[in-house]
Amino acid sequence: EQVSSVEVRGWDYTQKKLITSTANSEKVVTTTGNGQGSNSSNKFNLSQPPKMTVVDKPVFSAKQAEKMAQALCDELGGEFVYADAACEGNPKIRPGKIVNLKKIGDRFSGKYYITEARLTFNQRIYKTEISVRGLRTGNLFTTLTSQVHLQPGQTFLVGIVTNNKDPEGWGRVKVKFPTLTEEHESNWARVVALGAAKQRGFDCLPEVNDEVLVGFEHGDIHRPYILGGVWNGKDNPPEAIDDTVTGGKVRLRTIKTRTGHTLQFIEEDKGSSKKGIRIETTAGHKIYLNDSDKNIEIETSGGHSIKMDDRGRSIAVKSTGNMSLDAKGNIDITATGKIKIQGAMINLN
């Protein structure tokens, strides 16, 4: 298990970027005439010396990845030699200490890091037995305990959308997995959608460069599914969390497109934001169904408006320009009170 380097890859969702760190040299102090563990991986004269890439250990920062890469490199590098020895009893020889073994040949003389030590006293003989196993113990439990390494398809992966133009028209997308490789993209991945069925469902494909969570059918990385998009430190939710949540309850439920078209369900009043439903386009056209004030307002970005007010029992129609009523049939105007018509000039035909 000797490698020339150990690379740890992870995903920093606070910055929406890859975390990677590589350790090229172990810091374990066991050294012999053969050098260190990372050197032995180069003795086979391979065109590319073996290296380890770790993608199944979640890390949250570059510093954490650096420490993990170095720790794994130290662990592997310390195992390039196994040794057992016995000597006259000495309580100073214990795990974590270094012993210097001499006169056992150029290849084996050197400094050894003690993994285990046992002191025995038998028949008036005081003896210290040591084992060198790197940073792992050499007991039976450790030997028989297999290390679990999940294959990429056996867990969820972060994906970055690279293509959403499905040639079959099935609404699939392709992604790259930054923690695995920055060069390759996935097979076409089916997108999990609300109410998806024949010519129905919530059609909202992720866009290129969106971060998504990807699962795999039967653990096969060649059969990916997009489970949903996720927010991160660069791609924030459409509304500030202080406006969305009040006292542990979700006050706003918002659907917002890339260009700014918004559909918002307001569950509780807060300031000028009243309970109801609000629709607004990027250009500023608005429809507001206000349950708290018991009215409906329709307003254009240019200032034309209609307000139907149940509380005031009134309807107001305003225009910043001309207004016309056109009917193919009759127009009836009836009021139980007065009808007032006012203008600079009134023409009746």
Explain the meaning of each model-derived region.
Residues 1-3, 96, 251, 273-274:
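Glycine-centered loop/turn motifs
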Residues 2-140:
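An acidic/polar, Gly/Ser/Thr-rich interaction patch typically located in mid-to-C-terminal regions
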Residues 101, 313-349:
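Intrinsic-disorder/coil detector with helix-boundary
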Residues 117-119, 231, 330:
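Short, ordered loop/turn segments at secondary-structure junctions
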Residues 123-134, 139-327:
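Hydrophobic packing positions characteristic
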